């Protein structure tokens, strides 16, 4: 078998170390891929697949992309979940003896991509590491583009899923135990677009992980990191750090802190709630417009936009912390002139978090440094305005916001105002910063004059009128003479090249000038790059100062945004209580009111507490506004705990540890679950995980099955939630089962509300107003008419509905609820884990019932009226005796 060529041997040796990656192998001006990598890349990138002689009989499949456009191709592969290893030439091909030395300089994965063109500036690009050990989860999260690095430990899988949905990482790495734990990885991959890799066991070696962390953060014990009580969390953070060091091939000096956090510090929001409340994107279009974030986000910087998203996704549950934020928003709302001045200064500020990452990683170009400098120029006036602010949180921002004047002065003195993007082009260093640079520049510029004079002198000496001095990279400087003047060329001209219409020559004097000029250029470019690198390293050494300032700027941006939104939208400051009371006067849906023109949104009140107003049963027709009202209540509660002002006349918000929503459902065909199964799974999750401090938003429980089953389930859920020994959570419960309104008065903490409707003959007008009491009609036929159902169907539906009646069901509900209420008063109510065989359920039918059997046997056609009355009387007495 023929041997591989030396180049291909080098490729195969490198590829063997990165078998899970597509290897981008640098060859001149291209990155080439071979064999399986070429087949994959050509398919995914839709580029031509060719072949290359590799020393064997068959040519190796090959494709390639130009180096100057590599990021676009790389990003496309990474977005599809591939890892890409970048193998560069690490020595000058001119100096190489044999094959040019090459090394993998970085590995790009979905969670480690640093290309700003590929990243959304308003979102973090998180990578998460999950370790499952002894029924506990260690979770660490990092965004290497911003320097964020967190760690926590979780007791169960449900909390883990909440964290995954909260951070929405683009990549998860994990140990094999987690990968095989039965967690729904397919959902994470397909629905959330997360790439998941299981790493080898050595990544999770306890001793190695601890050593890596102590070494990176330069501490002697985990007490210095606040991690002395963490076990699997430390393993997770250490494994993640190891993975990042391997992929980035640098020191990760922008990861300056590992912050432990406790999930109990924040309101818990599961994936269903995040979707249903449309916190950061809409349910259907997956767009920001139409979400809560869209309403609140008036930030001026990328850092501020990311921080606001974190606020919305992680509401607080500490009253003091919430009020600190509200104090900041209130002062900035009142100080409108100062606020708008701050916002003007924030507008030119670039993304300092990601800029300092590029600087520390050595990938920042000269334009990045001028962007950095122009951002720093905005800091002194911002500090000047902040100094006058009174509230503690704004004063803390003032203290943290370092003006970084030394770094601003350095860049101003060292770097030209508009330098080129490419460092190899020179013209980076400002005049006067370095004497040697100025001297070499004079040589370079004077050299052009020297060349022009030499050209003129040679024309006069030789009489060759069109003689020109030119330059190319192959021959350097040369004299070009057209064939028509070839006879006038003197003897001291040495011919270098013959063209079709001209000859190219060199002279001793031109060679001397060339050496002087090109030598000066080479020295100048090398010196400029050296000085530029020194400036970059000086800035990188101050990474902690810069990151601290960036976070201060981001926080200030968020609070000025929230203050502006509060002013423009006529929001009010909510009062925060720990008594479990939610009292909203004239509340409005923050998003819907922005979508409706001319201030047409109808406001509504809400009152819930832990005693007699625990559950509000809301009835009314479809399209009347039940779902909007319930979502609005949840959003107002959430906004208050974020630290926002809220859309209401007044709001007193009791702290909620969690908000749950069960709003709408659809078949999950991929997992084989029907609408009803999806709904019941969500209900089960709520009943298992909610607490008495939770806020529940339940819409149309039980609608996916038969009327009797659905009503039974809805009723049982209301009873369960209302019982403080079982759950006792504040709840808004919308339903089409009007029969449930009979529970008011029977269950002491249940109250009825409905959406007001005005009837005009057969037509209805939705008033959108919540009023006390239950709806006595569903108005389904009228809604069908509004939807455009044909008149023939509408008229037939009216005929049928007159023949059907819900009175029997309603009276039965009332009867059973009353009996339960009486039993509870007498101390005879049954627990949920007991069975009262004597008590008939709502729709029980007894197969061997003698009354039913007698009814079946009656010959109605031969029964006289008197016999019929007597039979009816006898059967009625039997039933009365039974009850």
Task: Give residue spans per PLM region.
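Active-site phosphate-binding and catalytic loops of NTP-dependent enzymes
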Residues: 87, 110-119, 251, 387-393, ...
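Charged, surface-exposed helical/loop "interaction arms" that form contiguous linear patches used
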Residues: 361, 365, 375-378, 431-432, ...
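Cytosolic, long alpha-helical scaffolding segments
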Residues: 407-410, 414, 421, 477-493
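Extended, charged helical/alpha-beta scaffold domains that provide interaction surfaces
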Residues: 452, 460-483, 490
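Extended, charged coiled-coil "arm/hinge" scaffolds of SMC/Rad50-like chromosome-maintenance ATPases
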Residues: 416, 499, 503-537
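Charged catalytic and DNA/RNA-contacting regions of genome-maintenance
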Residues: 1-331, 347-360, 364-456, 802, ...
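C-terminal tails and terminal domains of large nucleic-acid-associated
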Residues: 841-883
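ATPase nucleotide-binding head domains, primarily ABC-like/P-loop NTPase cores
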Residues: 35-38, 230, 300-301, 308-311, ...
